[in-house]
Amino acid sequence: MTFGETRTRVATRHALIAPDGHVPSVLPGISGAVANVIISPAMGANVTQLLIAFEEDGHAEFPAGDLETCVYIMEGGCVAGIDDASEPLEKGGFVFAPAGKRLELSRPARGTKVTVFQKYFDELEDVPGPAPVFGNEKNVEGQPFLGDPDARLKVLLPDTPSFDMAVNLFTYQPGARLPFVETHIMEHGLIMLEGEGVYRLEDSWYPVTAGDAIWMAPYCPQWFVAMGKGPASYLYYKDINRGPME
């Protein structure tokens, strides 16, 4: 019995979603899996973030349409297919399916868990749309964030005008932190992958640990410090490469 206690907090411009409050949803196209809608437009977000835990016979299909989709393999592995192309993905793997492309996840290993980010594609005039992407974070070199070698950022998707979505992996050594409180137009959806720390969101300070998810609306002041005896890392989404009036 929890006696009504939870670390989850849903505010107007930010949210911390702790795993103790997850309630699965039945979603079209997803079978043999437990799916949780972590972030969605129902809370005011412009991005949807799903957490899907597959059984061995699980399957997920995201139909072609106006939504673009990025999937990150947190545990296990599966086969990802975009139209006629497919690749096996293991832990740390990711796949990006542009709007207009069908994405399928099949043949998951036991214990496979994925995070999914989806948003409506914001087309840019005279700029071609993005191409599909398959990869693994192991093959992406982490760069010191603003010169700090203890805070390393991996940019998983191409940072070109074709893409209006970024998905990045941020890893901090114990004691490393963001160098200032960020306040910007980009929206974030985030999930802690390992370790622990403290996240400042607006005027609230939250202890966070692996499995916690965070939504940050545009201009939500935000700051993070890694604490504990091991590294802390999180995966996050942000919208990029579009003007404020588009």
Q: Each PLM stretch: what is its role?
A:
Residues 66, 86, 99-124, 218-244:
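Ligand-binding loop in jelly-roll beta-barrel domains
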Residues 56, 65-83, 185-202:
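Glycine- and acidic-residue-biased ligand/ion/polar-headgroup-sensing regions
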Residues 18-19, 31-38, 48-65, 155, ...:
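Conserved short histidine dyad/triad with adjacent acidic residue
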Residues 37, 134-206:
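Surface-exposed interaction/gating patches
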Residues 79-81, 105-106, 173-175, 194-201, ...:
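Long compositionally biased, domain-poor regions of proteins
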Residues 1-45, 109-164:
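A short, N-terminal "cap"/entry segment at the start of jelly-roll beta-barrel domains
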